[in-house]
């Protein structure tokens, strides 16, 4: 993937950059793997905002992605590499030998015509999925399960990868994109390689309206609000808030640790690096 810049024909265009989409091979998704999703606007079933700064955006269709890779020992050929509006990575359409079609997250260097397979004895090449116990130490992996059969939860966004560090008894140690080292059951599935679309992090939005197209609403600073809306609000003229930074609900923020001790804490070997 490469980044495309524009001539400064307007203030919004001046710093705007965009993907060239040169790796995309088709513009129409597979109809059998597409469903409609209604936008929530960040509201729950009571109509109350549970996720702030969400709303609007272009209408999108959700592509059903195979995160489980549970179709074992049947080879599949990559039919196309496509854009997915719901994620930063590209997706690849697989045509299995038995006629079934599925989408997967497209790893780096996966091309149309390549063959991939999910198997305990699969080759160590990008796109193949194996149980972690069958993967050699030091291998770059993505799409990692946390619970057997639940589907991949770790290292799924553009350009991310994890590394297999060690194996002991029924657990493997995996170094995650954040720097955290975590124990994962060795029977969990993982996919070989790094997620594609590496230049996603280099894209510059360029203007406020483009964020609105993506369904992102403005984030208003607390010091710009009234006292009724935020603990930092109010005051005569411009103020700094008058207290240590807090959320709208009065909880300390900007570095304050809010994570509660969970049962999964014991699986963290090394905390993430800042």
Curated annotation (Swiss-Prot):
Keyword terms of this UniProt record:
Ribonucleoprotein, Ribosomal protein, RNA-binding, rRNA-binding
What Gene3D superfamilies would the database entry show? 2.30.30.30, Nucleic acid-binding proteins, Ribosomal protein L2, domain 3
UniProt keyword RNA-binding present: yes
Give the superkingdom in one word: Bacteria
- Is this entry keyworded NADP? no
Which Gene Ontology molecular function entries are recorded, alphabetically?
rRNA binding; structural constituent of ribosome; transferase activity
Q: Report residue spans for region: Disordered.
A: 223-258
Disulphides: none
UniProt-listed SUPFAM superfamilies? Nucleic acid-binding proteins, Translation proteins SH3-like domain
User: Which GO biological process annotations does it have?
Assistant: cytoplasmic translation
Q: What do the Gene Ontology cellular component annotations say?
A: large ribosomal subunit
Give the record's family classification: Belongs to the universal ribosomal protein uL2 family.
Q: Describe its assembly.
A: Part of the 50S ribosomal subunit. Forms a bridge to the 30S subunit in the 70S ribosome.
List the PANTHER family: LARGE RIBOSOMAL SUBUNIT PROTEIN UL2M, RIBOSOMAL PROTEIN L2
Question: What does this chain do?
Answer: One of the primary rRNA binding proteins. Required for association of the 30S and 50S subunits to form the 70S ribosome, for tRNA binding and peptide bond formation. It has been suggested to have peptidyltransferase activity; this is somewhat controversial. Makes several contacts with the 16S rRNA in the 70S ribosome.
Recorded protein name is Large ribosomal subunit protein uL2
Could you tell me which species this protein originates from? Answer: Geotalea daltonii (strain DSM 22248 / JCM 15807 / FRC-32) (Geobacter daltonii)
Q: What gene name is listed for this protein?
A: rplB
